[in-house]
Amino acid sequence: MMARDEENPAVPRVRTGKFSFTCANHLILQISEKMSRGQPLSSLRLEELKIVRLICVLLFHRGLETLLLRETMNNLGVSDHAVLSRKTPQPYWPHLYRELRQAFPGLDFEAAVFDETRAARLSQRLCHPRLSGGLLTRFVQRHTGLPVVFPEDLARNGNILFSLGTLYGHRLFRLAAFFTRHWGAEAYEPLIRIICQKMWYFYLIGTGKMRITPDAFDIQRSRHETGIFTFIMEDYRTFAGTLSRHPHRPHPQQQQHHHPGPPHPPLSHPASSCLSPEAVLAARALHMPTLANDV
């Protein structure tokens, strides 16, 4: 599913913006148009909604694997605990302790930690690929809802628990937990919608289904402040004729007599007054490494 088709001449492409060409697949073009316009997820058909969610889950899955691999490579040959735990948030350790208690229900951890012989025996047991791999999978699934199965080579590494702690404190880890926990909740729909937008366009560009011209990155870097994905979406809407520089704002008296449904905040203001206080707090927690367990 992640195979690139950028260099495949048999894949027809259509211009979808001044800086973008997209493969001429009707379903992809239809979803891209809805994503670029920021339509509520409820406006997508069931087939489209399943595809968007599957892509988001797939990208979270691959992203967590890549991050854990990166941290494992960074920790190779390091034996200083102060260095290994430099990027590990404090709330990670109580969660890891509870996970270890469930993995070894009959083990006295207090005695094992302060006794060198028992500690060495416990370390040998943790180095077993099946045991450590299961520990990693359960920990990630418990906190993100994603059943990520990591390769045995990662699980066999002696510093894997420190690498897992760095992964736990990463923003992508919290974003995955936020996405899986609040998917389908109406109060969080505007925030989930923004995540789906970014993930969708990242998927199209990463797999070669959307080709971006090189000058787009130069223009975006000097004239745009909200990122390449928002830049491409605005270009997409401008090309399709759906981008308004001056969005219509009804008069307050008109707003009192017109309530077609639950309001949705603008794309550029996800934490507006349309969101519930709980949704705003959850969104702010995504930027706080010490609150990863609250997401």
UniProtKB/Swiss-Prot annotation:
Q: Where is this region: Disordered?
A: 243-273
Report the gene name.
UL79
Q: Where is the composition biased (Basic residues)?
A: 245-261
- Subcellular compartments: Host nucleus
GO terms for CC?
Answer: host cell nucleus; host cell viral assembly compartment; viral tegument
Q: Where does the signal peptide begin and end?
A: none
Instruction: Identify this protein by name.
Output: Protein UL79
The species this protein was found in: Human cytomegalovirus (strain Merlin)
Main location per UniProt?
Answer: host cell
Q: Name the UniProt key words of this record, in alphabetical order.
A: Host nucleus
Q: Which domain of life is it from?
A: Viruses
